[in-house]
Every structure is written in structure tokens, then in C-alpha cells.
From Swiss-Prot:
Species the sequence originates in: Arabidopsis thaliana
Species lineage: Eukaryota, Viridiplantae, Streptophyta, Embryophyta, Tracheophyta
Annotated knockout phenotype: Altered root development due to defect in primary root elongation and root epidermal cell development. Temperature-sensitive male sterility and salt hypersensitivity phenotypes. The double mutant nmt1 and nmt3 exhibit severe compromised aerial growth and reproduction, extensive sterility, drastically reduced phosphocholine concentrations, and altered lipid profiles. The triple mutant nmt1, nmt2 and nmt3 is seedling lethal.
Modified residues (N-acetylalanine): A2
GO CC list: cytoplasm
Main localization category: cytoplasm
Chain sites annotated for binding N-methylethanolamine phosphate: Q245, Y246, Y254, Y386, Y400, R404, G405, Y406, K472
Tissue-by-tissue expression: Highly expressed in the meristem and elongation zones of the root. Expressed in differentiated root epidermal cells. Highly expressed in leaf vasculature.
Annotated PROSITE patterns: SAM_PEAMT
GO terms of molecular function: methyltransferase activity; phosphoethanolamine N-methyltransferase activity
Protein name: Phosphoethanolamine N-methyltransferase 1
EC code(s) of this entry: 2.1.1.103
Subcellular location field: Cytoplasm
Induction comment from the UniProt entry of this chain: Induced by salt stress. Induced by phosphate starvation.
Gene Ontology terms: biological process: choline biosynthetic process; methylation; phosphatidylcholine biosynthetic process; pollen development; pollen tube growth; pollen tube guidance; post-embryonic root development; unidimensional cell growth
């Protein structure tokens, strides 16, 4: 039975009174390696924040000030809030020389906490929501949306799934939730101002903390960035992916067809074949664009001892990828990100890998120029993607392309775009015959398991998959749809 509000607050307060007797970074992070982790993790977290120079910032669960001093150096004004008195006093003793900081002992769940609506540019919290009940998270999310200005941001970071720190604890009342809980609560949060205008939160980013992946092979440290927008704002393509093409049920359906961990053509079989062509070496860094639910990334990290960064625009895909990572202990980090707006430093990756994803991107030349910058000299790109015949598409095929929002090119034109972006040794292969063989095998498997498929999903799902696969085969047989494999180098 869920604890009452008073019981929940007492449990959490007593837990933190016990763990704040020793006011050190080890006590706050509940980890014996805290000092070393902090050196990598704190700069990483701060680097993820939107610009807040001269802005009004609220830090919830400020603790002894691990982030307070850093925030104070840039913020116009900062409120540092914590509900344990001796903890916030310690913070003030360390950071009180910053005259733009107000230190406050208060409980974020208390109705007595008064913050003016529309007064903040950024709300920052690090390990706070996991110490609140589900209902408290929902109520606080609503209040936070009210507190920030339109265009303002909310950043929070939480431990998901299970404990990360190695500190021994008599009891542990922490709520280690699935990331999809936080995504759902904040996505569904809507507020109205006095004039009746409606506002909601748009997800700007969601990723696991790289320092924990690198040092602990742990993907459960996850942060979110949200921006307050008018409810009329169109979230466009991301909403289409998560509500239409890649709904949670649809992803599981695709996974049944492609194999565990995969949502692209051929599953593990084609992954093994194509990854072999990249000549991966231990310690290399790979970017997977459109990583789906992570099967290819886990394979690369485990088999070749590389570090993989998987990005996907679909929140649902990344949620599944994070869940699949539990217990694998591999060097893979995941992020909800748009590859057309994402920024990485030049020369960041040894390999960029993308499977049946770039068909969604309208400006491929711009994306390939970006890939070229992100790759290190000597780096390699490998892409498989839907393509089309050079001839004029039929009305039916044109309608299919339009309905899916695809941007398709013929295989040679696709390869030329890579050359134009600066790549050399470009290989552009028409793999349509292989595509058709794989489609037939996948279709045959689904049809043989018809009763189980319908039992696990539905008759409608079965008909969608069978009809969709047969349509792909027909389009390929009529020389309209193609499948291309592209490999290129950066000298």
C-alpha cells in the first residue's frame, strides 16, 4: 500500500537526516567513488543545461552545493532550496559569498512554498524526483510549469531502474522508476494562465549520463530537458514517430519481426554482416544515428569493445533501449535527439552508423556534411537505407512516400551526396535482392507463428505486418523501391 503524504515525507526526511550527518560529496552521492565521479559527472551535467547567463534560476534539492556555486557564477539570480536544514546551511557556508544566491530551507511538495508564476528562466534539480511519490511528482511538475516563463526550461536528472551508488543503507525509500514514467508525466503536463492560454512542455533532450556509462557501464542515470511552450506549438515529426509509426505497441511488434533488440531490416544477421565491414577496434567511439531499441549498439559494444552513442528522435525507442540495457554492463549511452539539430565537437567519432533511418531526413546533403565534421580523420560512415529507382515513381509509390514522410533517392544519387559532402572511397551498393530475401524470411516466420502473433498482439497487428511486408516485396519486384548500402571514408 502506498504511503500517505505525511508518511512519505517523514520517511524521506529521516532518510536524508541519516545520510547527511556527514556533509561530504560521498554522503550526498551515496558512493565511495563520488570524488572521482564528480570530476567527470558535474561538468557533463552542467554542459547539458540551456544558456542561463544573467537568468533567474531555481535549484531544487540543492544539497551541500555541488552545483550551487557553478550555477551562481552564471545566473543573474539563484534560489538554492533543500529540505534538510543543516544541509542548506552547509551550502550557504560554502557558497554564501555569492551575493546573487538566496538559500532556502523548504520542502518542494509543501503548499506553503510560494514561488511567483512566470518568474523563472530555469529550474534545475539533480536527484530529487526519485525521493517523491508518484503523485508528488505529478503535482510538482504542474507547479514547475507554472513557475517558469514561456520559453523557460526545466532540467532534472534521476536514478532509474535501480541503485547506482555503493553506499550501504539500512533502508532505501528511493523510487527507482522506469524513465518512461517521467517522460509521460512531464509530456502530459498542461497549465493555463489567468488569460486562459494553455501551455505544455516540449522535450528538448533526454539522455543517460556518459560519466556513469564510462565508469560504471551503467545507463540508469538519466536527465531530461524540457521547454515551456504554447500548447498550439506543433511538435511535428517527433509526435508522429511516437504516436503513429513507433508507438510502444508498434515497436514491440517490429521487434517480434526483426528479432530481439532490433527494429530494422534483417535484425542481428544484417547487423553482423555490416558491422564487420567497419573494422572496429577496441576503444573506438561509434555514433549510431536512429539507434532504435539498441540491439546493434549492444552487439558492437560487447563484441568489439567500442563505446557507442545511440541517438533516436523517438522517445519510445530510447525508453525501450534503456530498459534493454539493464544488466548488460556495456559501454553504450542513449539519447533522445534530432540528428539534424544535435551538436557534437568536430572529430568526435571513429565511425558513424545508421540503419534504415535517414529516409526520414529531408536535407540529406546538410546531414552528410555534418557527419563529415563529426568524424575523425580516417573515420568511416556506414548507412543502409530505403532508396528508389531512378525512374519516375508511380502514383501509388508516390503516395506511400508522401504518407510516410520519406525522402528517397536512387542508389547512385545517394552515393553522390556522400561524395559531395567530402567523403572518399564511396561504395554505393544496390542491396535490393538481399532486402527481398530478408523480407521473405521475415514474412514466412510471422505467417508460421500467426496464432501466437495474434495472441500476443492482435489480428489487426498481424494483418498490418503481413500486408506491409507483401507491399514492400511488390514495390521491390516492380523495380520501384530499392535498398542501398553505403560505406565511405573521411581521409
Amino acid at each position: 500500500m502506498a504511503a500517505s503524504y505525511e508518511e512519505e515525507r517523514d520517511i524521506q526526511k529521516n532518510y536524508w537526516i541519516e545520510h547527511s550527518a556527514d556533509l561530504t560529496v560521498e554522503a550526498m552521492m551515496l558512493d565511495s567513488r563520488a570524488s572521482d565521479l564528480d570530476k567527470e559527472e558535474r561538468p557533463e551535467v552542467l554542459s547539458l543545461l540551456p544558456p542561463y547567463e544573467g537568468k533567474s534560476v531555481l535549484e531544487l534539492g540543492a544539497g551541500i552545493g555541488r552545483f550551487t556555486g557553478e550555477l551562481a557564477q552564471k545566473a543573474g539570480e539563484l534560489i538554492a532550496l533543500d529540505f534538510i536544514d543543516n544541509v542548506i546551511k552547509k551550502n550557504e557556508s560554502i557558497n554564501g559569498h555569492y551575493k546573487n544566491v538566496k538559500f532556502m530551507c523548504a520542502d518542494v511538495t509543501s503548499p506553503d512554498l510560494k514561488i511567483t508564476d512566470g518568474s523563472l528562466d530555469l529550474i534545475f534539480s539533480n536527484w530529487l524526483l526519485m525521493y517523491l511519490s508518484d503523485k508528488e511528482v505529478e503535482l510538482l511538475a504542474e507547479r514547475m510549469v507554472g513557475w517558469i516563463k514561456v520559453g523557460g526550461y526545466i532540467f532534472f536528472r534521476e536514478s532509474c531502474f535501480h541503485q547506482s551508488g555503493d553506499s550501504k543503507r539500512k533502508s532505501n525509500p528511493t523510487h527507482y522508476r522506469e524513465p518512461r514514467f517521467y517522460s509521460k508525466v512531464f509530456q502530459e503536463c498542461q497549465t493555463r494562465d489567468a488569460a486562459g492560454n494553455s501551455f505544455e512542455l516540449s522535450m528538448i533532450g533526454c539522455k543517460c549520463i556518459g560519466a556513469y556509462v564510462k565508469n560504471k557501464k551503467n545507463q540508469n542515470q538519466i536527465c531530461w530537458i524540457w521547454q515551456k511552450v504554447s500548447s498550439e506549438n506543433d511538435r511535428g515529426f517527433q509526435r508522429f514517430l511516437d504516436n503513429v509509426q513507433y508507438k510502444s505497441s508498434g515497436i514491440l511488434r517490429y521487434e517480434r519481426v526483426f528479432g530481439q533488440g532490433f527494429v530494422s531490416t534483417g535484425g542481428l544477421e544484417t547487423t553482423k554482416e555490416f558491422v564487420e565491414k567497419m573494422n572496429l577496434k577496441p576503444g573506438q567511439k561509434v555514433l549510431d544515428v536512429g539507434c532504435g531499441i539498441g540491439g546493434g549498439d549492444f552487439y558492437m559494444a560487447e563484441k568489439f569493445d567500442v563505446h557507442v552513442v545511440g541517438i533516436d528522435l523517438s522517445v519510445n525507442m530510447i525508453s525501450f533501449a534503456l530498459e534493454r540495457a539493464i544488466g548488460l554492463s556495456c559501454s553504450v549511452e542513449f539519447e533522445v535527439a534530432d540528428c539534424t539539430t544535435k551538436h557534437y565537437p568536430d572529430n568526435s567519432f571513429d565511425v558513424i552508423y545508421s540503419r534504415d533511418t535517414i529516409l526520414h531526413i529531408q536535407d540529406k546533403p546538410a546531414l552528410f556534411r555534418t557527419f563529415f565534421k563529426w568524424l575523425k580523420p580516417g573515420g568511416k560512415v556506414l548507412i543502409s537505407d530505403y532508396c528508389r529507382s531512378p525512374k519516375t515513381p508511380s502514383a501509388e509509390f508516390s503516395e506511400y512516400i508522401k504518407q510516410r514522410g520519406y525522402d528517397l533517392h536512387d542508389v547512385q544519387a545517394y552515393g553522390q551526396m556522400l561524395k559531395d559532402a567530402g567523403f572518399t572511397d564511396v561504395i554505393a551498393e544496390d542491396r535490393t535482392d538481399q532486402f527481398m530475401q530478408v523480407l521473405k524470411r521475415e514474412l514466412d516466420r510471422v505467417e508460421k507463428e500467426k496464432e501466437k502473433f495474434i495472441s500476443d498482439f492482435s489480428k489487426e497487428d498481424y494483418d498490418d505486418i503481413v500486408g506491409g511486408w507483401k507491399s514492400k516485396l511488390e514495390r521491390c519486384a516492380s523495380d520501384e523501391q530499392k535498398w542501398g548500402l553505403f560505406i565511405a571514408n573521411k581521409n
